[in-house]
Structures are given as C-alpha cells and as structure tokens.
From Swiss-Prot:
Listed name of the protein: NADH-ubiquinone oxidoreductase chain 1
Gene Ontology MF terms in the entry: NADH dehydrogenase (ubiquinone) activity
Role summary: Core subunit of the mitochondrial membrane respiratory chain NADH dehydrogenase (Complex I) that is believed to belong to the minimal assembly required for catalysis. Complex I functions in the transfer of electrons from NADH to the respiratory chain. The immediate electron acceptor for the enzyme is believed to be ubiquinone.
Gene that specifies this protein: MT-ND1
GO annotations of cellular component type: mitochondrial inner membrane
Length: 301
C-alpha cells in the first residue's frame, strides 16, 4: 500500500500535467475550472469514470474481458517492487530479470483485452501493440545487458554505487538515446501510439471498454510511463545516494523522473505518428544492429 497509493496519485496528477503541457503547447490553458488551477480535475475524472456503468459487449468473453484490465494494472504496480528509491521494496538478486519478465507479461493483458472484446478494431490494435512491445523489448534487453556488464551485477541497487562518480550515460550515450526511444515505444506513447491510431482504429485495443475497466487500463499506461522513466534514471543518471540524507536521493530521483516524463509529453506534442512499417524498420534495421554492436563493444571493455 505504501507504494500503490503514491503511484496512483502520481498517475492522477500526471494526467493533469499532460493536459496542461499539451494545452500550453497549443496556446491554450488546459483544465482550469475544477478546483484552483484545475488541480482537482484528475479526481473528478476518476470519480466520473468509476461511477459509469461498465459496458460489456454481448459477444465478448466475459472472464478475459474483466481479467485483462486488472492484470494490466497489477503488473504495472508490481514493476515498482524492485526499484531502488534508494532502497527497494523487496531486495532481489535478479531484479532486472524480474522487471523484464513482468514487462513481457504485460503483453498478455493487451492481447486478451483486444481478443476478448470480439471487435475487429480492438483485435488489430492489440496485435499491433503486441508486435510493437515484443519487438522493442529485444533492444531494451540488450541495452540492459550492456549496462549490467558495466554494473557487474543483476541487482538494481548496485547501480547507485556504480554511478557514484560518473553517470553511465557518459560512456554509453548512444545506448541511452536508443533506450529512451525504445521506452517510448514500449509504453505505446506518441509518436509510437500505433495501437490507438484514432483515424483507423478508433481507440485501439481498449475500444470496447468504458468506465472502471477503461480507467484501469489508463492507470496502467501512465504507471508504466513513470516506471520506465524511473528505470531510465536508475540505469543512466543514477542519483547520488548520501547515506546521511537518504531523502535527498529520493528528491533528486523524482525530480529527474519528472523531467523525463515532461519530455515524454513534449515529444507527444511535437511529433506526428509513425507508420507501422517505419516503426518496425527503425527497430529491426537500425536499433538492433547498433545495440548488438554496442553490446559486443561493452563485452570487450
């Protein structure tokens, strides 16, 4: 509970931040009616979504239809367990592997939701999402492997000591760039949000969801965004952990995560969506060879 509630609160205010950032980038105010400066908007949205009647298509598979959003949110929250801030919830030896396994499992939630809706749009959206997530996980795994070679251990907590004197982004900035772009693709954000191409697929895999279940998907997506940014910070921009003031580490860490999250929103406001083939070309023809070469280079170091 100590992590779940703050994460959900962070997600709520991230939605507000996103609407504000996009608003100001389009020369308008964003939500500013509910509460001072629109601060109560996310709470109003949540209440509205959860008191709506959850619709369920007649032809859909009920069990999977309900399980998919709950699984998505559960996995999104479980990913936070091994993150050191500065101490993880559960200190695992193979925390990186745990996170990779969970992020691969998240594909199932998307696949089930699209398949159980029994709608063509949802199915196409889900298939796209699955292909995209699985593809980009390949580069993420290789980049993580390269970082672990410098770290010398599978535990995330040791990255803090590794980066005491210099950030890992310095020796491996091409990896950091590819990692950042891959995290955007992994979390299905613009310009990689092919799963919900409004012009062609209405809303993608969650097209048949309304009310509560839709809110769960929404929460899962944004929790994943914050989590991926937190992981980026841990891997490449390790905050300095001063043992006398551990609070400073958390503040430093969260400030960087906030900056990266704002960067995500900035990218969303700036760039148009990719075509599906461009997305796959970028990964299999550009990122994969590059990451493999970098990984080999790190092995030789």
């Amino acid at each position: 509970l100590t992590t779940i509630i703050p994460i959900l609160l962070a997600v709520a205010f991230l939605t507000l931040l996103e609407r504000k950032v996009l608003g100001y980038m389009q020369l308008r105010k964003g939500p500013n009616i509910v509460g001072p400066y629109g601060l109560l908007q996310p709470i109003a949205d949540a209440v509205k979504l959860f008191i709506k009647e959850p619709l369920q298509p007649l032809t859909s598979s009920l069990a999977l239809f309900i399980i998919a959003p709950t699984l998505a949110l559960t996995l999104a929250l479980m990913m936070w367990i091994p993150l050191p801030m500065p101490h993880p919830l559960i200190n695992m030896n193979l925390s990186i592997l745990f996170m990779l396994a969970l992020s691969s499992l998240a594909v199932y939630a998307i696949l089930w939701s699209g398949w159980a809706s029994n709608s063509k749009y949802a199915l196409i959206g889900a298939l796209r999402a699955v292909a995209q997530t699985i593809s980009y996980e390949v580069t993420l795994a290789i980049i993580i492997l390269s970082i672990l070679l410098m770290n010398g251990s599978f535990t995330l907590s040791t990255l803090i000591t590794t980066q005491e004197y210099t950030w890992l982004i310095m020796p491996s900035w091409p990896l950091a760039m590819m990692w950042f772009i891959s995290t955007i693709a992994e979390t299905n954000r613009a310009p990689f949000d092919l799963t919900e191409g409004e012009s062609e697929l209405v809303s993608g895999f969650n097209v048949e969801y309304a009310g509560g279940p839709f809110a769960l998907f929404f929460l899962a997506e944004y929790a994943n965004i914050i989590m991926m940014n937190a992981l980026t910070i841990i891997l490449f921009l390790g905050a300095y952990n001063n043992s006398t003031f551990p609070e400073m580490y958390t503040a430093n860490f969260m400030l960087k995560a906030l900056l990266f999250t704002t960067f995500f929103l900035w990218i969303r406001a700036s760039y148009p969506r990719f075509r599906y083939d461009q997305l796959m070309h970028l990964l299999w023809k550009n990122f994969l060879p590059l990451t493999l070469v970098m990984c080999m280079w790190h092995v030789t170091l």
